[in-house]
Amino acid sequence: MEVAIPKDLQQEASLAKKRYMDLCRQGQIFDARNRIIGGDTQAWDVQVRNQKIKEVTEKARDETFAAEMRHNDKVMCIMHDRELRHRKQLCRAINDFQQRFQKPETRREFDLSDPLALKKELPARVSDNDMRNTISGMQKFMGEDLNFQERKRIQKEQNREWSLQQHGEWERAQAEHKLAEHLHTQTELKFDEAARDLQRLEITTRKAVCAAVKEFNKKQVVELAERKRQVKQQEQEDNMSEITNLLHGDLLSENPQQAASNFGPRHVMLDRWKGMNREQLEEIWSTWKQQIHEKLRLQEEERQHNMDWDLRRTRKAHASLLQERQQQRLLREQRRALDCSNLSLAKQQYLQKRQLDAAPSSQPTEDYFSQFNTRSR
């Protein structure tokens, strides 16, 4: 198993940060909507303004065409109605002319001696199998037999039966669909009822568990209070015993022999020792004064050392400030030179663009654009 050390974790975090920054830079370069690097914002603004002007112009032209089309449709409807009225009037005039001036008795084939001769003649065909009904006579075509009406009636009856059958099948399908929906609804209701029962059971179980936990917590609190009371009572008894022992012991009675030790005269029992004599106190005071002088000397040396380091840090900070100001001055000069160079390049690109726009050129293909912006840098 590999063990991750802090150095590896720091290196991995640095690489992840670099990858994230590269992805952000690629999004700023390759994303057409959010790209802010490598683009001409002024040209984009001009394109957007031209596109809006084009859209407004096209919208006005479409509205003009639509108004003209509505006008033409209205004119066509008026002319169509006028033509229909003209045809009706012409047909009515023809019928009136035929009824007035083209009567049957004025025709050339009308026989004065037998006015009903045409009515007495045999029809063009007596039946569908008439011998006179030849092909050249053109008296019978497909669907023009004498049983056409009967066949038409049978077809209508058959269509009606089919329609009734389809309607019955549709009603049965609707009934089956309603039955399926009813069964589905009943199943959902059963599932909902079961879910509600389970939910009620869960709530009841949860309440029982909460009540049991609450009762257990109450018992724990009572037991804890009892233990605390017993501990406090035992502590009070111990304190009373200790106070009694101290009151009747050698410490408060100031017995000088109580501090004597079995290890020699220079050893004492600290819990019974009442203090030192004058010689011991003077020796301790002398040692303490020497320690004070030594500590003052060390503090003075440390202060002098700190002053030297402060002076060095001040000089170094002053030098760093001067160097930083020099660096900022150089950066401003470089930035000013870069701005001038960018301005001249922008002017050259603008002139080249105007020349390219003025000169005829072929439409670039997708292969031409795919060779640019293949990397983030």
Curated annotation (Swiss-Prot):
Cellular localisation = Cytoplasm, Cytoskeleton, Cilium axoneme; Cytoplasm, Cytoskeleton, Flagellum axoneme
Stated name of the protein:
RIB43A-like with coiled-coils protein 2
Keyword DNA damage annotated: no
Q: Which InterPro entries does the entry mention?
A: RIB43A (IPR008805)
Q: Could you describe the subunit structure of this protein?
A: Microtubule inner protein component of sperm flagellar doublet microtubules.
Q: Which PANTHER family does this chain map to?
A: RIB43A-LIKE WITH COILED-COILS PROTEIN 2 (PTHR14517:SF10), RIB43A-RELATED (PTHR14517)
Name the coiled-coil region(s): 188-238
According to the record, the residues making up region (Disordered) are 355-377
Point out the gene that encodes the protein.
Ribc2
**What cellular component terms from Gene Ontology apply here?**
axonemal A tubule inner sheath; axonemal microtubule; sperm flagellum
Describe the task this protein carries out. Microtubule inner protein (MIP) part of the dynein-decorated doublet microtubules (DMTs) in cilia axoneme, which is required for motile cilia beating.
**Composition-biased stretches (Polar residues):** 360-377
